[in-house]
Curated annotation (Swiss-Prot):
The gene is proA. Belongs to the gamma-glutamyl phosphate reductase family. Gene3D superfamilies: Aldehyde Dehydrogenase, Chain A, domain 1 (3.40.605.10), Aldehyde Dehydrogenase, Chain A, domain 2 (3.40.309.10). This is Gamma-glutamyl phosphate reductase. It is an enzyme of class 1 (oxidoreductase).
């Protein structure tokens, strides 16, 4: 089955690569319209997944990711329409030069070919990936989690109907709809057909893909994000930034997980932090250096563990540690961070510059929330993932990250001498 899907995807990718921007945009508009027109079918399928998820005692954060509503589906359809307004990178000339030989050389963006995506209980990913791959002329093979089985079937059926309406092969967007985990292991070996693999899920999924895939893998999305409050920070403003980074959307990979506080301000700042977090119903996981001052406020405070520093909370929980200075803060981030998004709150230009130079993360912020690490916020449009590695793509992956390039030489019967 998988080999047939791979062959069909490869064939479809050649067709997609020839489409004009107008043809691709038309297909996207049809997808968006059909998502709304077939709302009842999609939501009924999603309800089947929700019932099964509740019976399996899936946690609240996962249930929220899995849930589709009329409003959410409308927003997803609107997001697909927004992709139409994004600049098509395919065919763009990155650079070029005229060689001494007379050969005119260009480096031009082209589609990757076939993109594989493995993800968990996120039905929106099915549509996000499909729309971005279509815009960039790539075919896609999707493997969603068993939790989204019925929803993905319904959504992919809509997408394929739209593609066929626009005379595009339905195999351009395919989904593995069997929950058999052995199929994941086989998919990881399909380097003959899949050009790039993107896992969207927890650390275990990323580890599996890194260790077993023969396909180039883009890893990321694991966000143990830090903010360091320096001794010179504006503490009132710092509280606002911390609340935004932690509370706005705790389940996001760019939400704040560990707060580091300079020891010079800890006694005065931590009680204020505790009161602010209590108002937001955030539980604080405190080190021995932080716990006494935090308990002077109203928040629920518990002891932090070593494991807490290593994992994403993705909930209204926050680690708090007091550090000696900037050097210690950077050392902590190097030890426990995931190279996703880290921030410093400071009024010291030299400290800000040093933090930016020495913290090796995909996104580093000065006096700003880590929540900005997002394709839409960066002005890239939609994103297919957030990469925390350094090769091919780093940070939010917009349309450009779903392309590669080829060299094109124009001559006049030009010979190499």
């Amino acid at each position: 089955m998988l080999e047939q899907m791979g062959k069909a995807a490869r064939e479809a990718s050649w067709h997609l690569a020839q489409l004009s921007t107008e043809q691709k945009n038309q297909a996207l508009l049809v997808i968006a319209d059909l998502l709304e027109q077939q709302e009842a079918i999609i939501l009924a399928a999603n309800e089947k997944d929700m019932v099964a998820a509740r019976e399996s005692n899936i946690n609240a954060a996962m249930l929220d990711r899995l849930l589709l509503t009329s409003e959410r589906l409308k927003a997803i359809a609107d997001d697909v329409r927004q992709v139409c307004h994004l600049e098509d990178p395919v065919g763009q000339v990155i650079d070029g030069r005229l060689l001494d030989s007379g050969l005119r050389l260009e480096r031009r963006r082209v589609p990757l070919g076939v993109v594989g995506v493995i993800y968990e209980a996120r039905p929106n990913v099915t549509i996000d990936v499909a729309s971005l791959c279509l815009k960039t002329g790539n075919a896609a093979i999707l493997r969603g989690g068993k939790e989204t089985h019925h929803t993905n079937q319904a959504v992919v059926a809509v997408i394929q109907q739209a593609l066929e309406t626009c005379a595009i092969p339905a195999a351009a967007i395919q989904a593995i709809d069997k929950p058999d985990r052995e199929l994941v292991a086989k998919m990881l070996k399909m380097d003959e057909y899949i050009d790039m693999l993107i896992p969207r899920g927890g650390a275990g999924l990323h580890k599996l893909c890194r260790e077993q895939s023969t396909i180039p893998v883009i890893t990321g999305g694991i966000g143990v994000c830090h903010t360091f409050v320096d001794e010179s920070a504006d503490l009132d403003q710092a509280l606002n930034v911390i609340i935004n980074a932690k509370v706005q959307r705790p389940s996001a990979c760019n939400s704040l997980e560990t707060l580091l506080v300079h020891e010079a301000i800890a006694e005065s700042f931590l009680p204020q932090l505790s009161d602010a977090m209590a108002a937001q119903k955030v539980t604080l996981h405190a080190s021995q250096r932080a716990i006494t001052a935090l308990k002077k406020g109203r928040a629920t405070v518990v002891d932090v563990t070593e494991a807490d520093y290593c994992d994403e909370w993705l909930s209204l929980d926050l680690n708090v540690e007091v550090v000696n200075d900037l050097t210690a803060a950077i050392a902590h981030i190097r030890q426990y961070g995931t190279a996703h998004s880290d921030a410093i709150l400071t009024q010291s230009i030299s400290h800000a510059d040093r933090f930016v130079r020495q913290v090796d993360s995909a996104a580093v912020y000065v006096n700003a929330s880590t929540r900005f690490t997002d394709g839409g916020q960066f002005g890239l449009g939609a994103e297919v993932a957030v990469s925390t590695q350094k090769l091919h793509a780093r940070g939010p992956m917009g349309l450009d990250a779903l392309t590669t390039y080829k060299w094109i030489g124009y001559g006049d019967n030009t010979l190499r001498r």
